[in-house]
Amino acid sequence: MGETAAGIYGVSTKIPNLISTISTIFFQAWNMSAIEENDSKDRSRFYHRVFDTYQSFMFIASAGLIVFVRILSNILIDSNTYPEYATAFLYTPVLIVGVLMMCFNQFLSSVYSATQHTTHSFWTSLVAAIVNIVLNIILIHIWGIMGAAIATFASYFVCYCIRIVDARKYVPFPVNHAKFAANTAALFLLGIVVVEAPPMWILILAVGFVFMVLYNFNAITQTLGQLRRRK
């Protein structure tokens, strides 16, 4: 990629970084709780509840950012001064899902920290880095900036697939893979609608966001209720 393309890619990461900020706040509190719960009898149930809630909340937040990506881009990106950055929003939805996968990986790394298997964080991250480099070399020549965005998502997704299997060897807890797949697919569909802007696209986005909230809200409310009773 040239300097302009690299600049567009850099600008398009501004909104996805908001997801990372939200996750960091949660992760700081969660990491301590994970260590405290490591020796408890119900730690598997605890991990299941928190991870399910965390995923649900992050999927809703990601959907919200994708739905409002055009508005947020106009606020955060000065396309009047730098008109070449006006197209940055086209790549943002893929990067949002990529950063979301990174956040899930960060959560799973807490399992390694709590169970003292931190080397697994290293080698799974190494695999992701290798995938990212290889895919960037291949996809940038084919799709340019979008290729780089897809490579970012794919590398974090590969890391997630490895960690969701490996980390649960040390703390077995159930994961709803079908729900994860449905949520991820829904985010990509919302992203396609934002980019392509088909007829009635605003209505489609509104319906899609409501679906994401309703599909995930129950997990959040149930866990919050259980945590209150636990206290």
What are these regions (language model features)?
Residues 5-23, 52-56, 98, 133:
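Alpha-helical transmembrane segments of polytopic membrane transporters and translocases
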